[in-house]
Amino acid sequence: MVKRHATLLALACFAAVPASTLAAESWMRAQVEALPASVRQVLPCGQWTQASRQGTYRVVEANVNEGAGSELYVQWVTDPLQGDPSRITKTVAFSELNDDHSQYRFESVQCRARGAAIEITVKARYEHDEDDRLRTFNVRVEPGGSYRLDEVGARKRK
């Protein structure tokens, strides 16, 4: 009987401990906790190679103005080499989407590798649209950092 009560007491104590304190500490916990709350998502997307270095493209979506708008970035992150940690070697911003006077609020961001380049599809709402329609943008980012941004279904200007 005493053994049964001891087991129940042990289980009750275990259940009272918050799950977060039971999780094992990780190497990256401090860095992850240091991420700004405005970073909405980070997507790995394809591989790049330049001279003797290689790595992964990283797409970063962030909220601005308390979530009223969104911004998009692509970063080149190196693969770690023999004790040399990963580094961000380049960051590209998209002025067509990241304008705080004409903000877009992203509904979804998807990315896929296309050979050495990447293509990002952004579905967003524009703050000045009266009909609150969903716009779609395709962004092709080349290995050197140049890009082409097109709005799907947009009228061509003369």
Tell what function each PLM region has:
Residues 9-17:
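Bacterial N-terminal signal peptides
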